[in-house]
Structure formats: C-alpha cells, structure tokens
Amino acid sequence: MRFRFCGDLDCPDWVLAEISTLAKISSVKLRLLCSQVLKELLGQGIDYEKILKLTADAKFESGDVKATVAVLSFILSSAAKHSVDSDSLSSELQQLGLPKEHATSLCRCYEEKQSPLQEHLRACSLRVNRLASVGWRVDYTLSSSLLHSVEEPMVHLQLQVVPAPGTQAQPVSMSLSADKFQVLLAELKQAQTMMTALG
C-alpha cells in the first residue's frame, strides 16, 4: 500500500514495527513527545530528560525511546517534505494501526508546526555545509627557485565552513596562482548565477 507521507511509496518496515510502540504511551504524552521532536527538527534542540520522563510510565528501554524519537522524526519530517495535510496524515497513520486518538494528537501537533517545519527543511535541503567567513591575502614572490617568473602573485584563501547547524566552524585553507584563482572566481560566479535563477 502506498502512503502520501512516505512520498507515495510503501511505508518502511521499521516504521510499521514502531507504530505499536507509539500506541503504548498515552495520546497526551505522545503529543508532548511530538513537540520535543518538532523542536529538534526545527533546530532548537531536544530535551532527552523530558523524553525519558514521558516514556517512563510505558517502561521503555533505551532502544525503545530512541526508536520512538526516530519514528516520530521520520513521520513528521516526511509528512512536511511531501506537503501532506493533517487529516490525510491522521487517516494514513490509522491505516498503519495507530489508534485514532494517538493519530489525532500527533496530527494536531504537526498542524501547528507544519509551515515553520517546511520552511526549515527547505532552508536545510541540498546544503552540505555553510560558509561562515572568507579571509584572503595576496603574496608577491620576488624570487624563488620553484616559480618560473618573478613576482608571480599567489592568492591564499582561508574559508571558515560550518559542517552542520550548531557545530563549530572549521578552517579550510588553500593557495592558488593568480590564473587558477581567476578560473575559480569565474566558476563560482557562474554557480551563483545558476543558483539565483533556481531561486
């Protein structure tokens, strides 16, 4: 069977397996869990202490807690990516075996944060990392046994790259001849023009 929140594909087996785990907790606690997972998806961080307290009554092991967070994260982010409305999501989750009040509770939480979640996912998609800053300097070598001509300029670039949101910037250094720098600059401008057109 195909589901819209899975991109009109079959639901992954691991998600099917975890639906029964979600049914073990109350619908109120499921809603509170969803709000924590949505905070994580929106880049605001997750409170694992709160999650452990919410799942304590169901006597979840650490693997169950992680699986619960993972399945909620998958359902919410996948539904947002595929622009599924909350009524359709509720219906599909009930088809997978999630009790109606649990599905309603999850979908109410999803509906409240659907727009900001889609905006955040759009901003993060197709990004490997972000450029925090660029430093550069040009050196003129007056004489060297390695260079063919005297006074050939060298461009030294220092990029500060943030690999993922919330992580420290890492330096990436490179040295280029003036010719190679001109080629790099032209290609970067061309890429920027193409990205702006996609916009």
UniProtKB/Swiss-Prot annotation:
Kindly list the places in or outside the cell where this protein is found, as annotated in its UniProt entry: Cytoplasm; Nucleus
PROSITE patterns, sorted? COMM
Q: Major location, coarse class?
A: cytoplasm
The COMM domain sits at 130-199
Could you list this entry's UniProt keywords, alphabetically sorted.
Answer: Cytoplasm, Nucleus, Transcription, Transcription regulation, Ubl conjugation pathway
Q: Which organism is it from?
A: Mus musculus
Q: Would you name any one GO CC term?
A: nucleus
Assembly and interaction partners = Component of the commander complex consisting of the CCC subcomplex and the retriever subcomplex. Component of the CCC (COMMD/CCDC22/CCDC93) subcomplex consisting of COMMD1, COMMD2, COMMD3, COMMD4, COMMD5, COMMD6, COMMD7, COMMD8, COMMD9, COMMD10, CCDC22 and CCDC93; within the complex forms a heterodimer with COMMD8. Interacts with RELA, RELB, NFKB1/p105. Interacts with CCDC22, CCDC93, SCNN1B, CUL2, CUL3, CUL4A, CUL5, CUL7.
Which InterPro entries does this chain map to?
A: COMM, COMMD4, COMMD4/6/7/8
What name is this protein filed under?
A: COMM domain-containing protein 4
The Swiss-Prot or TrEMBL record describes its family as follows: Belongs to the COMM domain-containing protein 4 family.
Superkingdom of this protein's organism: Eukaryota
The UniProt function text for this chain reads: Scaffold protein in the commander complex that is essential for endosomal recycling of transmembrane cargos; the commander complex is composed of the CCC subcomplex and the retriever subcomplex. May modulate activity of cullin-RING E3 ubiquitin ligase (CRL) complexes. Down-regulates activation of NF-kappa-B.
